[in-house]
Amino acid sequence: MTATKHQRRSGNPAKPPQPRYQPGVWHRNHQFAIFGIVGATALTLFAGFLGPSAVTLTLGPRHSYLPPWYLPANVVKPNEWFVSIVIWVAIVLGALGLWAGLRAMADGWRPKYKKIFVLGTVLSLLTSLVPPMTSADVLMYAAYGRLQAIGRDPYEITAAEVFRSQFDPVLRWTERPWQDTPSVYGPITSWTQLVANKLGGENMHDIVFWLQVFSVVPFILACAGAVMLAHGDPRRQGRAALLTIANPLLIWAVVAGAHNEPLAVMFAVAGLLFMRKNPFVAGLGIGLAGCAKVSIGLWGLAMLWAYRREPKKALLLCLGTAVPMGLAYVLWQPTAFFQALRNGGYVSVGSWANPIYTFLNLFMTEYHAKVVLGVISYIGLIVIAWMLSRVVPWTAAPGLAKDADLKRDPLTIALRTALVLSVAWLITSMYTLSWYDLLAWIPLAVLAANKLDKIMVIRGAALSLAYVPGRAIDMGPALDFTATRIRDTVSPIIQIGMILAVILWWRQPDRPELFPFKKAKALPTTTAPKVTAPQAPASKPPPRSSPSKAARAQEPVPVSELASRRKS
């Protein structure tokens, strides 16, 4: 049980005392949650500020005072083990802090969403002031923008084709393994990459700064939209702020890596804000999101499903979606859409699919192994989505009238369906990474707490740990062995465990634990305890009298006694 302490509001003694949350154990302690969130970001900033290392990207020469900031190269040379351990500790600390925060909220903690949102915003902005870490994707964003700046098509030509034939001050700083891969991003994302190159010139360091801006600003706006979706319910708004902008797993995976997922999610959240008001504008939002990244189409399907009983609104949603999608993929960049679908053919090392892919490669070609995995993945997506649709609780999105049917509210349906489809896709996809989780965290944050909270924390922490250092660079054999085992063994086992957790949830929806490690308490075989009312003072019972002979003669005689009488 959690103890609560009552305090009166200062300045107005007439008002009743305000309950203040007092945790009983550390894993329900909101103060530990805040410590874990802030501590994780502080460790991330520390590792980034040390400068280029096995974890932190090398951005080339600096010719301006623009961020990202870090120590000069001749000050310190970070040890690869030291910075890797710092980031591993940061991820674990952040995950524990988030876990404690969720348990504290379930136990009665009511965080003020404005304070949590400001905290998360500050942490995100600070994280964007140091170099990106572990993932070299941002260098490829810069490369695709550079190709456009010099008049080449990033959907047709690769960065390696250029820098292998001629010197280029930007492309030379890219890293494997994506140097030979054309762009797979939508036209709007490609446009931001071009703008970053225009603003940063021919300096990779400055270009990366602007790409960080195009990551952190949409991230903050998308999280603000999630809090707005929870308007009218301070408790739900506090949850939304904690699981989005102040989520240490997202700050690490999305902001520290300067990934472009927030750009698509920002437009999609804007579309959700209009689900109850204007389906055409909602369609414009999800259409713009699809122009940034095609994978956000899962939310589009969820929004269309929400209007399935209202054909006119469904048509308006489709028309709104078609306007930006048609302009972007038909007129602006016709080849972009097909290139964007290429991610479906990859297998990420940290996913559930990697061990199976390795096994299939023993007796079939890589192509056929991927085909088999693809079939399994799509079947799994359908099955897991169906299972989740049966067990994810129906909770109304804030703002719904009390007398309204939540199962006919388009916003509630869209959020719940987006959550179901996103989680099903994330845990069954052959190619899955921790920064993709933003697609699921946003709708999950707006809806009420459920088992997916735990699943997403465990999944995100495991994938984040798996990609530290996470770069295709030379490192010591000991670190390489350790990081590889986390990536190709530990993480896939945990990802398979998350699929199993969903299946067990579907089979036993009333069990509070993810896994049946704890034996269910057996029901008592004895009768229920009697509830007695307060008894009156005991009085002396009347004297007991024996029944008369006539009464005893009328009492029924047992059969055995009757038989003995007959024998005698």
Where are these regions (language model features)?
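Transmembrane helical bundles and short interhelical boundary loops of multi-pass, membrane-embedded
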Residues: 2-5, 12-22, 28-90, 325-400, ...
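Transmembrane-helix motifs of polytopic, lipid-linked glycan transferases
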Residues: 93-103, 209-236, 382-390
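Intramembrane catalytic core of multi-pass membrane enzymes that act on lipidic substrates
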Residues: 109-212
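Membrane-embedded helix bundles of polyisoprenyl
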Residues: 120, 216-217, 229, 237-275, ...
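Transmembrane alpha-helices of multi-pass, membrane-embedded glycan-processing enzymes
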Residues: 189, 193-200, 211-225, 264-267, ...
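Specific aromatic-rich, kink-prone transmembrane helix
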Residues: 225, 263-279, 386-389, 422
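Short hydrophobic alpha-helices at membrane interfaces in multi-pass membrane enzymes
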Residues: 269-292, 316-317, 417-420
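Perimembrane helix-loop-helix junctions
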Residues: 298-322
